[in-house]
Design a protein with these regions (language model features):
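N-terminal, positively charged nucleic-acid-binding surface of large information/translation enzymes
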Residues: 2-186
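Acidic, turn-prone loop/beta-hairpin segments
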Residues: 54, 374-400
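Short, glycine/acidic-enriched loop or turn micro-motifs at the edges of active sites
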Residues: 57, 237, 408
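Structural signal for well-ordered, non-membrane alpha-helices
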Residues: 83-89, 115, 119, 206, ...
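Short linear capping/connector segments at secondary-structure termini
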Residues: 95-101, 343-346, 378-384
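A glycine-rich phosphate-binding loop feature that marks nucleotide/adenosyl-phosphate handling sites
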Residues: 132-136, 295-297, 346, 382-386
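Conserved small/polar residues in nucleotide/adenosyl-binding loops
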Residues: 402-410
Length: 410
């Protein structure tokens, strides 16, 4: 099929926050996205697979200060330094087509234009923010949304925040977002829909604080330099700026947007299924076709997170068990929409049972038969049968993959 004739398929991971090295949970999401991208290429699609890093925010600024370096130096080391994120994805054979960093000049330029446009159309206005803020999650919360006085997402401490800020009229789009979630398959799996509607939309969406003045590491609001753009506004639009929206770096926006699916962890479904479509509605832009909120990898029933320090290093696992074995384990073991209990014991058990025993025995028996019947050498000339022709046809065409769909694959 000619390149211009191919259907397009645009798939993304979330862009990861480089406050520390990534853990096996991030690898899980990226490997799953990679598997889907490879699968769609087998079907003959023109695939755009995007991943990257979300590099602004108060947490990065605080981490850099504690390390005695600039924020840019801090994220450069995590992203592009030895055994950084770029090295990890290379090690794990991730086939992404692009990698975006929110500190890239073209992205910063685009975000300033986007923020200004929403301001000029009346959906961003100036006010004063008073409420709770979770620095690890870079999230604003009302008192009623807290869980036992702590962040409902990560369980961490929140602090009072009071500062001049710009706000996005999120409340204006509550009805349209609710309709999107409840009448379409935009958000998957369906279990996530009730959570978003019951916990966030129906209690009443408040306008979203979209700028900060209490720190400086972010995209400056070009018409009010004392403000930097809220990190989630900066981050979410990466899916469009990486295609050239409002910049001249790339020219693929009309070709690939809207995205076919965003794969994201369930802890950021709220941003992708409520805030993201609302801002796109404000901009008059098409919405992504699907957001898929996958589950967490947990250890002994507890969530794995950088802030808790209870993470598993994918480099260690890949070096010990091999990249292909680790990829197989992540894709084989955990239902994608549900949480999964990770343990070294389960990893070893899966490798032994599925690879060493089943696949290993097949290879062992095949090589033994080659040795016994052909003297250890396969004949260079052989007679093909009808069964051989059928097998060749099956493995050389993507048609056999077309019965699989996103829900069955995930």
């Amino acid at each position: 099929m000619c390149e211009a004739c191919k259907k397009t398929f645009y798939i993304t991971t979330p862009i990861y926050y480089p406050s520390a090295k990534l853990h096996i949970g991030h690898t899980y999401c990226t490997v799953a996205t990679d598997a889907m991208a490879r699968y769609k290429r087998l079907q003959g699609y023109d695939v755009m697979f995007l991943t990257g890093t979300d590099e602004h925010g108060q947490k990065i600024e605080d981490k850099a200060k504690a390390a005695g370096v600039t924020p840019q130096q801090f994220v450069d080391n995590i992203v592009a330094g030895p055994k950084g994120i770029l090295d990890l994805w290379k090690l794990m054979n991730i086939s992404n087509d692009r990698f975006i960093r929110t500190t890239d000049d073209y992205h910063v330029e685009s975000i300033q234009k986007i923020f200004r446009k929403m301001y000029e159309n009346g959906d961003i206005y100036k006010g004063e923010y008073k409420g709770k803020y979770c620095t690890p999650c870079e999230s604003f919360w009302t008192e009623s949304q807290l869980k036992d006085g702590k962040c409902p997402d990560c369980g961490g401490e929140v602090h009072d925040a009071s500062e001049e800020a710009y706000f996005f009229r999120l409340s204006k789009y509550a009805g349209r977002v609710r309709e999107l979630l409840t009448t379409t398959d935009f958000l998957q799996p369906k279990s996530r829909v009730n959570e978003m509607v019951n916990n966030f939309i129906d209690p009443g969406l408040e306008d979203l604080c979209v700028s900060r003045t209490s720190f400086t590491w972010g995209v400056p609001v070009d018409f009010d330099p004392g403000h930097v753009v809220y990190v989630w506004v900066d981050a979410l639009f990466n899916y469009t700026t990486a295609l050239g929206f409002m910049n001249e770096k790339y020219h693929d926006y009309d070709k690939y947007w809207p995205a076919d699916v965003h794969f994201v962890g369930k802890e950021i479904v709220r941003f992708h299924s409520i805030i993201w479509p609302a801002m796109l509605m404000s901009m008059g832009m098409p919405l992504p076709k699907h957001v898929y909120g996958h589950g967490w990898l947990v250890m002994d029933g507890g969530t794995m997170s950088k802030s808790k320090g209870n993470v598993v290093d994918p480099y260690v696992l890949a070096e010990k068990f091999g990249v292909d074995a680790l990829r197989f384990f992540l894709l084989r073991t955990f239902p994608f929409g549900s949480d999964g209990n990770f343990s070294n014991e389960l990893l070893i058990q899966t490798i032994n049972m599925d690879l060493a025993n089943d696949l290993g025995n097949l290879v062992s028996r095949t090589t033994a038969m080659v040795e016994k019947y052909f003297g250890g050498t396969l004949p260079t000339e052989r007679l093909d049968t009808d069964a051989d022709d059928d097998l060749k046809q099956m493995v050389s065409t993507p048609v056999s993959y077309t019965h699989l769909t996103l829900p069955t694959k995930a």
